Amino acid sequence: MSSHPQTFYQLTGRGHAPANLSNATLLVIDAQEEYRSGVVQLPGLDAAQVEIAKLLDAVRAQGGAIVHIKHLGIPGGLLDPRGPRGAHLPEVAPLPGEIVVEKRMPNAFSGTELHEKLQSLGHLD
């Protein structure tokens, strides 16, 4: 087993050039406090958060676009949009000017403006 995550291209033995970050859009999906301190805590979240932060730094440095996807859960329940567990993880939270798309379904395209936002950015990678 590999000591670091691999892409689908690597897992299938295909090569692929790295994305051009200045022409890329990074999607950060559901990086929310519920997964660190709520009832659906994820193992390995701290390590994942470090990697997300590295990606954010790299894309920001190259002027790429960033879209944060935030799940709006049930008031008083999972991913409570009014409570602290529904908040973005502060270490990887959106900066002013970065796009935030709020979703209520597991599919970030369902009932959101994600498709339109991505199309308007016009990025290829």
State the predicted function of each range:
Residues 1-100:
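Active-site acidic carboxylates
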